[in-house]
Amino acid sequence: MNKGLFEKRCKYSIRKFSLGVASVMIGAAFFGTSPVLADSVQSGSTANLPADLATALATAKENDGRDFEAPKVGEDQGSPEVTDGPKTEEELLALEKEKPAEEKPKEDKPAAAKPETPKTVTPEWQTVANKEQQGTVTIREEKGVRYNQLSSTAQNDNAGKPALFEKKGLTVDANGNATVDLTFKDDSEKGKSRFGVFLKFKDTKNNVFVGYDKDGWFWEYKSPTTSTWYRGSRVAAPETGSTNRLSITLKSDGQLNASNNDVNLFDTVTLPAAVNDHLKNEKKILLKAGSYDDERTVVSVKTDNQEGVKTEDTPAEKETGPEVDDSKVTYDTIQSKVLKAVIDQAFPRVKEYSLNGHTLPGQVQQFNQVFINNHRITPEVTYKKINETTAEYLMKLRDDAHLINAEMTVRLQVVDNQLHFDVTKIVNHNQVTPGQKIDDESKLLSSISFLGNALVSVSSNQTGAKFDGATMSNNTHVSGDDHIDVTNPMKDLAKGYMYGFVSTDKLAAGVWSNSQNSYGGGSNDWTRLTAYKETVGNANYVGIHSSEWQWEKAYKGIVFPEYTKELPSAKVVITEDANADKNVDWQDGAIAYRSIMNNPQGWEKVKDITAYRIAMNFGSQAQNPFLMTLDGIKKINLHTDGLGQGVLLKGYGSEGHDSGHLNYADIGKRIGGVEDFKTLIEKAKKYGAHLGIHVNASETYPESKYFNEKILRKNPDGSYSYGWNWLDQGINIDAAYDLAHGRLARWEDLKKKLGDGLDFIYVDVWGNGQSGDNGAWATHVLAKEINKQGWRFAIEWGHGGEYDSTFHHWAADLTYGGYTNKGINSAITRFIRNHQKDAWVGDYRSYGGAANYPLLGGYSMKDFEGWQGRSDYNGYVTNLFAHDVMTKYFQHFTVSKWENGTPVTMTDNGSTYKWTPEMRVELVDADNNKVVVTRKSNDVNSPQYRERTVTLNGRVIQDGSAYLTPWNWDANGKKLSTDKEKMYYFNTQAGATTWTLPSDWAKSKVYLYKLTDQGKTEEQELTVKDGKITLDLLANQPYVLYRSKQTNPEMSWSEGMHIYDQGFNSGTLKHWTISGDASKAEIVKSQGANDMLRIQGNKEKVSLTQKLTGLKPNTKYAVYVGVDNRSNAKASITVNTGEKEVTTYTNKSLALNYVKAYAHNTRRDNATVDDTSYFQNMYAFFTTGADVSNVTLTLSREAGDQATYFDEIRTFENNSSMYGDKHDTGKGTFKQDFENVAQGIFPFVVGGVEGVEDNRTHLSEKHNPYTQRGWNGKKVDDVIEGNWSLKTNGLVSRRNLVYQTIPQNFRFEAGKTYRVTFEYEAGSDNTYAFVVGKGEFQSGRRGTQASNLEMHELPNTWTDSKKAKKATFLVTGAETGDTWVGIYSTGNASNTRGDSGGNANFRGYNDFMMDNLQIEEITLTGKMLTENALKNYLPTVAMTNYTKESMDALKEAVFNLSQADDDISVEEARAEIAKIEALKNALVQKKTALVADDFASLTAPAQAQEGLANAFDGNVSSLWHTSWNGGDVGKPATMVLKEPTEITGLRYVPRGSGSNGNLRDVKLVVTDESGKEHTFTATDWPNNNKPKDIDFGKTIKAKKIVLTGTKTYGDGGDKYQSAAELIFTRPQVAETPLDLSGYEAALVKAQKLTDKDNQEEVASVQASMKYATDNHLLTERMVEYFADYLNQLKDSATKPDAPTVEKPEFKLRSLASEQGKTPDYKQEIARPETPEQILPATGESQSDTALILASVSLALSALFVVKTKKD
């Protein structure tokens, strides 16, 4: 073998070993692991392979645009913790990511030799215009590859001034997705490279980054509010000189993924919403090369332009190898009527095949070894010939050293033109019981391999010898196919393939294997076959081997279930010219291959599922209930004239999409439950609708009953591996544990619930490795579990489930993933399976390559039921006919011939590359009908490149933009009767087209129908002339043509929904009884083409009434209708049960709809009118009586000019009791415990906190202990009481409305007052607030109006309480009648107490939960106002960080309010409360340290934006840092105070991460007001982030302070100075405890009094004193007053006749008032620890009035509180 193989990128290692007298060189495996592999050894990994076999694969084509280098083995990346929050540049540059460079480095010395630059080639990468960020670009060529060598220089650093490079056309795409795919070599000196990619780059402080330094690969993101980087175990950085294929995708929703050489660099990262929003308009993608000291980054990026590069030559001399020696071999033959095989009796080896006089070799050299668990064994073989076609081999396999003791039976059988290689029996003599524990996993037969035993080969001595194989590629620019001539000499080959064929000019052969092997990720996954070049004598042979099989496997000693085992099997098929083109090649082999291949379950349905879409339910909103989805199916059935449909139900379970994962049988109750789901399944069959569900087998949420500690995946450090965080913080599971512990049972539970009829299961996420091994074998086992229930298998990724899946979401949803992560890009694979899968690259021109008008199309998926907010019905239908009808038409045929054109040059996504387009594809069906698809031009710059001509049996059925295509199948694929056969017509352009009809259509008349959502309309009778018709019709409008007249099927709308046509889809109101002016009620369409009822311009009340059917007697129901009222006229829903009438109404709608999956949200493309939607559901709750025969529902609108819109009426059982503890809508105290919410978050609706989004507020279900306080450090309960609470996840610092009530849900009547109470949990102080508003709260693009809200911030609930807290507020209805209450996200940041990332999310610091909402109408009294105010103010007076003077004034005012008379008037109470509010606003913070405002000047050397003021801002995340160029150690930081100020010491707070600039030795000089200098020094401070103190030992009245770091830590040492904070402490006078001696003495004296009145006075004083003490209200003046008051009390015997009694300075309540009547404020009011918990800035501007009130009210308060005592 050629020594050059070792120098290739693949680093393929070939070893020789003797087999008797022959020496065979074989290649068996790739060096590396799949990115989806986790804890255990998996198929294809290095650990799985025999020591004597090869450990990598060779590249078939060195420069074909793919890097086949084997990935390195990386540690399990997990999901390590991250730290969120504002960061400085330096903190984010820890771990040597962003470090300054020396001003004068020693030298620039890239490792690579100086390149030779071709004169005619220009660089593709350019350095940026900013001079500080410029590097160098040169062109170099090495080993037949051209590169742009990018280098950083001495002027660069690794932070603000790295070398940056850009490439024309490489930007974030129009959908907001960023995709980077590049091949590069690292030419830096070892360990000195700092390279990576900036995505959505604004500047070095605002971006997303993926790259590496000496410690390995990491991600990082930066924004003004949130910045962090990856802190987990890293994948190692590339070795110097290594070739790397880097692929990065950043989706518009913030999901970041990256791999290098097909190894995932980290688990999926989801950017915080704040970061994603901040960067959403940034388009730049740049490469970065950093410098540090004399360390330079030098990388060579492979260019797109490889023209003119001298490639490596094939070996010049012929190769020779050992000759065949069969002298000791005994051969036999087995044969069928057409195929003969020569076989070795000593081993199941085929020497040669003969077919019709032509031959193909098998394994020509002798081979006799099996590899069990990667241990090579020469078995003892017993040969037995069964009959002429079949031979059997009994193998005894022993290896005592490795505990192998087994027998295996292998059968070779010839069947027609096939050779079957089957392991028919395996006996493991070790005791192995599936599902049970085994003491030593070595006793398992984990893997079985016959690598080295080629099943079929081709020789260079044969004419036309070729090998053709397909690997996985999802890059639209790069085909996964290899086409290799087998010659001598030729390049070495050892590589894994999904499909492989060998051929000569006479015969072609294909091989199938059920091996579920992965040699790695990407192109190395799904490698069931291994192709290997072997030199025998003077000929080269390329043989196809089955890759390794998996058999018995286990998880930590638990043997996997029996069903995971699959007996090894492989088949060879040999054929001559199968497509009759007089040429034999791989295509003939591929046609024959279909006779031996596996067929994924349900593949027969694929061709007929033309109308795929997603119906979305999310966040408890039940946007698309099951039975409403049924109406959507009927609507599409009409609009497509009966095409088959596929509906993926995202959110069928729990509270909707991405909630309750792993509990597959938890059918969503709010969307209809099991009963409605089964009805949907059954009724959908009639319309050929195939239903599937979205599930997740990789992560779980705490609400799921399957969430438990054992199943959860952990990181290497023992922390949990967190997954998706939206409604809840998910945690990844260990998929292997799940498999070993009964995953199958969950599918079986679902099957029991639903019965038969469900068509497919779509497995989300699986394939990215977040649950461990998601490779070929693990995926096949998962698919088998699903198939076992009778369900088709579907998956998310284009590369996922290649063996079993029939639908791949990222392939079909063309906007997903970017050009590197689409469908399967392999002509070989598509040739074989085009009719079986929707897995192909579709037509999405901007992706380029295969995506630029694939001839066979490719599914293009759109939606109209809420997925990604897509509710554009017309757009869905247009796309279906423009893209999908012809794609599905082709799938009714199998491909028989594929002709490529000449390569074209394409430029897109920052790449210029060669692509070879298919120019002509032939297809045939079982009846020999022939379809030919031809591209009109091979010129990519011609419009005709994107046009095709399609003929059926020679007759044109598509010509460019127009098609008239026959469709002779019903929705389920059954052939139509002749009179129902039809043709679809569609043209993307207007204009006349002429068509020849088939002979059996050439009658005098045919009938054309326009297709709409009402079915076939506008019938036209067309005359056929000379067998032709001419059509001149609308563009982008579907039509259907029939031989004879047709009618539409009768639709029974809204089956099971108790009303006819809940969504007004029938196009008529004839089912309603209309009173009033019926002409004012009509069906119209929204901007999203959604049908609605509109009532407008009516001069009298208009009502529409319909009977509700199918109701149960004496049963509680809820009914709602969506309403958008643009009029002030009252719009109502009324239910009359015959015994009772229930009505709910709304005036003008005031809340925009922000629910993304709702068809009526306020996105422009879904809006009602005027680009807005105020649709919200309006409910009536009612109870039926004994007679349900005449229950009616009425929609009405009173007279008015403007429009009211209604849509989506839904009636269903509901057991809530919200109205005075009764079910029916009515008066009384409103109570919502969230236990029986009908739908949504009633009585609230979602606010604009996220804009139109899949909102993060939902009904949370209890699963103790995982949803509750304590588990995994959780601080708050997700569920407060009962089984359900309302949870908001992570919506802090938004300054926007989270949710609100609306009048139709609860009406605060004008002038009436209500007490609103609720229990709540909040993870941080004042991040959420209770608000009262009126009218529309405008947010988002309409601006925010928080200043109009009455806002009450809510403290956290866990630092001082073991359970949720209760909040009470008084709300008075505005005269406008549109008052509402809600929860608001303030501008305050959460306090995560040092936790970060998933821990911070899971533990609830950012969350808010509500329960037990109660709204009670009350008669407002002054007492109520005072009690409510006290609850709000008492937490504030408990604070200790305000000055005594300002706090005492507040305390005394609050105490006086607490002592107010019960009969205080409302006006008096409000006046007193206003005064207290002014005092609260006037509180003055204590000064404990110097702040920036205390200084007249702050002078110090500093890096830009990292000045000395940062050390006085109270934020440890910001730094003072000297210049990153170094050289500032020993330079002073000088601080001059405005006024001499007393200080007592310095506390130095180092940076929180990293060590650059940490002070080691310091000198501190403090100059006092007299000019005297006080000098202090410190030496050898340790290098950590703990504070360091210098205690002056005295108080100095300082005027100037000079701090000098004379020695510092960090890279290189003594280069920088830095500080997070410099805290110069001020002397603190300890507050003297209140002197109670006078009071106590007076009390002792007063207690001796005997008069009853005096005793009551004393008791009253004691009670008031106790109340004041308990509630932190006591002041010195109050103590003095209480003592004086007691001292003046005297018994009647000693009282003077006319006593002079001081009028009380402080009000005292009577003793009766104190006994059992004073609220226990300690119980109800929490006392936060810091003032920020009570009085943070809201982020809203304060009015001038408020400022004036604060100053004036101080004077007013004195009149109330301070009274001069008489002598």
UniProtKB/Swiss-Prot annotation:
Catalytic: region residues: 602-893
GO-annotated molecular function: carbohydrate binding; endo-alpha-N-acetylgalactosaminidase activity; metal ion binding
Binding site residues for Ca(2+) 2: D1233, E1235, E1281, W1284, D1411
Keyword annotations of the record: Calcium, Cell wall, Glycosidase, Hydrolase, Metal-binding, Peptidoglycan-anchor, Secreted, Signal, Virulence
Catalytic residue positions: D764 (nucleophile), E796 (proton donor/acceptor)
Comp. bias (Basic and acidic residues): 61-75, 84-111, 304-324, 1717-1730
Family: Belongs to the glycosyl hydrolase 101 family. A subfamily.
UniProt protein name: Endo-alpha-N-acetylgalactosaminidase
Phylogenetic lineage: Bacteria, Bacillati, Bacillota, Bacilli, Lactobacillales
